[in-house]
Swiss-Prot record:
Keyword match Transmembrane: yes
Family according to the record: Belongs to the complex I subunit 3 family.
Lineage, uppermost ranks: Archaea, Methanobacteriati, Methanobacteriota, Stenosarchaea group, Methanomicrobia
Location in or out of the cell: Cell membrane
InterPro entries xrefs: NAD(P)H_OxRDtase_bac/plastid, NADH_UbQ/plastoQ_OxRdtase_su3, NDAH_ubi_oxred_su3_sf
Gene3D superfamilies listed in its UniProt record: NADH:ubiquinone/plastoquinone oxidoreductase, chain 3
Gene Ontology cellular-component terms listed: NADH dehydrogenase complex; plasma membrane
One GO process term, biological-process aspect: methanol metabolic process
Reaction catalysed by this enzyme: methanophenazine + reduced coenzyme F420-(gamma-L-Glu)(n) = dihydromethanophenazine + oxidized coenzyme F420-(gamma-L-Glu)(n) + H(+)
Pfam family name, one: Oxidored_q4
Listed name of the protein: F(420)H(2) dehydrogenase subunit A
Role according to the record: Component of the F(420)H(2) dehydrogenase (FPO complex) which is part of the energy-conserving F(420)H(2):heterodisulfide oxidoreductase system. The membrane-bound electron transfer system of the complex plays an important role in the metabolism of methylotrophic methanogens when the organisms grow on methanol or methylamines. Catalyzes the oxidation of methanophenazine to dihydromethanophenazine. It shuttles electrons from F(420)H(2), via FAD and iron-sulfur (Fe-S) centers, to methanophenazine (an electron carrier in the membrane).
EC number: 1.5.98.3
Subunit description: The FPO complex is composed of at least 13 different subunits. FpoA, FpoH, FpoJ, FpoK, FpoL, FpoM and FpoN proteins constitute the membrane sector of the complex.
Species assigned in the record: Methanosarcina mazei (strain ATCC BAA-159 / DSM 3647 / Goe1 / Go1 / JCM 11833 / OCM 88) (Methanosarcina frisia)
Length: 129
């Protein structure tokens, strides 16, 4: 009886193992195929910057304002929040959730709103100061 239960649990993880194996094999396989199938050119003109037919002057590197990074970090944080909220809302709509889960989600949302208000008060969301 215990062996039957264990085999059922192991069988339920077979799709996860397959997904993990494919996920680990595909990136190196793709990189290998790109390296083997891509055209190769040793011409020096392939490594220069193209500027509408004119000869490039100076370097292509520029310094970005640090404010752009603040926007990027804020976007990533709020995007990850949505990734946590969407499955919760789907389960809540489909099956219903206990009141403790609702309280936990409100605490999570409160922490997110606190972070948003903090960014707003520090004027991190102001584009031009």
């Amino acid at each position: 009886m215990i062996g039957d239960t264990m085999s059922g649990i192991i069988d339920s993880y077979i799709p996860v193992a397959i997904f993990l194996a494919v996920g680990l094999i595909m990136p190196p396989m793709t990189m290998f195929m790109v390296k083997q199938l891509s055209p190769r050119s040793k011409a020096a003109s392939k490594y220069t910057t193209y500027e509408s037919g004119s000869v490039p002057t100076g370097t292509a590197r520029i310094q970005f304002n640090v404010e752009y990074y603040l926007y990027a970090i804020a976007f990533v944080l709020f995007d990850i929040e949505v990734l946590f909220l969407y499955p919760w809302a789907t389960v809540y709509k489909g099956h219903g959730i206990t009141s403790i889960a609702v309280v936990e989600m409100f605490v999570f949302i409160f922490i997110l709103l606190f972070g948003y208000v903090y960014l707003w008060k520090k004027e991190a969301l102001t584009w031009v100061k």
